[in-house]
């Protein structure tokens, strides 16, 4: 049986000027091209056809955007779309949306303390003033908890809701349950400074959101509201001009963002 000596070609030489095509005496130019359309050369040499693309959807407000992948596992992926001061997450190529419900949090903007129950232990202080909730545990073993009841109409009880919570100065401990102090609807979680959107399905006529702090310094909550219907977005500090300078890295289920 005769031996075959197949030729091995390297297609990663890339594109060169037409004036250089005649320089076949230069090893690197022998397999270069003046035009390379719909081909993807790789560093190690092979080249393949560029995969097809298709229109999925417009960016938020048709604005310039940068997409950052989120990959937690093979079946847990998302896309973080950054546009002008807005972050819009997408799952399975569709934005996360909030349903239309009639539920609301009375005095969720803390314009008044009516309806809010403030409990302090160990010389701590919890105040609602100037449109803010401020909690401060000045003494060791101090604790502040602030909660209220939120009514859910019968037609909305099986519909997914979301609390939109703005923290001016964190961290703040938050939970929500079917009874005061419980967390059977939203498990106890720590909210850092920023805007948060926490989804939940009430399955009850009344739910009880609660804020808590054990810290010996001021923590400040700006507001808690029920998300309006439509695509869920979050504010960011990055304007359109900042988008090319965004850098990111992911660790488990956390994406760290920076901007040069």
Residue ranges, per PLM feature:
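N-terminal beta-propeller domains
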Residues: 1-99
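Polar, enzyme-active/binding microenvironments
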Residues: 60-63, 75-260
């Amino acid at each position: 049986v005769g031996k075959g000596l197949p030729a091995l070609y390297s297609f990663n030489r890339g594109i060169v000027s037409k004036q250089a095509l005649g320089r076949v005496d230069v090893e690197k130019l022998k397999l270069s091209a003046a035009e390379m359309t719909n081909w993807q050369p790789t560093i190690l040499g092979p080249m393949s056809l560029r995969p097809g693309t298709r229109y999925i959807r417009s960016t938020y407000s048709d604005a310039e955007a940068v997409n950052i992948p989120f990959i937690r596992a093979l079946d847990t992926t998302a896309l973080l779309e950054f546009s002008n001061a807005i972050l819009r997450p997408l799952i399975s190529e569709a934005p996360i949306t909030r349903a239309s419900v009639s539920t609301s949090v009375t005095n969720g903007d803390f314009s008044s303390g009516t309806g809010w129950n403030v409990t302090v232990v160990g010389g701590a202080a919890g105040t609602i003033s100037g449109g803010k909730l401020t909690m401060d545990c000045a003494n060791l073993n101090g604790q502040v908890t602030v909660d209220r009841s939120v009514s859910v109409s019968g037609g909305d009880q099986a519909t997914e809701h979301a609390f939109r919570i703005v923290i001016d100065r964190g961290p703040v401990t938050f939970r929500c349950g079917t009874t005061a102090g419980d967390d059977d609807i939203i498990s106890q979680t720590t909210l850092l400074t920023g805007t948060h959107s926490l989804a939940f399905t009430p399955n009850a006529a009344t739910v009880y959101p609660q804020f808590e702090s054990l810290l010996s310094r001021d923590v400040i909550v700006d507001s808690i509201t029920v998300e309006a219907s439509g695509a869920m977005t979050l504010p960011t500090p990055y304007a359109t001009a900042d988008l090319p300078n965004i850098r990111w890295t992911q660790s488990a289920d956390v994406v760290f963002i920076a901007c040069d």
